[in-house]
Amino acid sequence: MNVECVVTGASSQIGGPLLELLPDRFFRVNAWSRKPQAEVRGVAWQRADLSEVYKIDETVTHLIHLAPLALLAPVLEHAHPMRVIAISTCSVRHKASSASPAERKLAEKLKNAEKQVIMMARRKGHQLTLLRPAMLYGAGRDGTVAVLQKLARRFGFLLVPGRALGLRQPVHVADVAQAIVGCIDHDKTIGRCYELGGRAQITLRQLAERVLTDNGKRARVYSVPSWLLRPVIDAARILKIRPDWDVGLLDRAQKNQTVDNRPAMRDFGYDPSPFNGKGLTRKVIRR
């Protein structure tokens, strides 16, 4: 059993299922968050804001970073050498060629954050693994599947931009938690970056249909011209209903955003679950 780990951003989507798994592998689990959550077996919560400088105790052997990646490099700079597993996102690649300048700028910021983390890890002797999940779902807090779930339950139908034939590969947060544990257990993942998708590659239209049927609704999905949805997305962002939305998603609805799971499957036995449109029923498996 490993000695001690720190989980930053522990109240994030992935934090819930991950904190259920870590006490089986560490004598002590420290969960850092600006908003500590309910007590979990074997987990000690600590209020922490990574925009400030925090010193990690010398007894900590592992750092699992779920907070925004841009906050990690300063933490690594002031820490002793550790095993580090950090969550990035496939948006680094998928939004790099977006029609939206804002999305391209975001992708560039994410890429720069990855570069800074990699350079700092090498400089300070940390053993780093980067994980890039695809479209997250399962905690009811994501910007795509959770939104579709709420709309499906309320209205019984969903609207998609155009034909919405771009492929997606939604990955459950519990599968990402299992991937983190897999990296802890397999040293061959050190120095690598893995993209993580779900088991299924489905079009955005099929995803909407699955959300409806898995929630007991008829598969009523209607195509709407993108130009009609553009003011809706702008309004949702301006009114802060969905501040993360951008009109670039209308263009990306027609493009594939998938990943290759084979490197993760080969190196640490990654085995994602089938897509579940309810999303909230995935059981965390202790291995």
Predicted regions and their residues:
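N-terminal Rossmann-fold cofactor-binding loop
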Residues: 31-36
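Substrate-positioning beta->alpha
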Residues: 142-147, 162-184, 191-195
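Mid/C-terminal beta-alpha module of Rossmann-like enzyme folds, strongest
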Residues: 186-245, 261-262, 266-287
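Conserved sequence/active-site signature of Rossmann-fold short-chain dehydrogenase/reductase
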Residues: 92, 136-138, 176
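NAD(P)H-binding glycine-rich loop region in Rossmannoid oxidoreductase-like domains
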Residues: 37-86, 90-101
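Alpha-helical membrane-targeting segments
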Residues: 147-173, 218-257
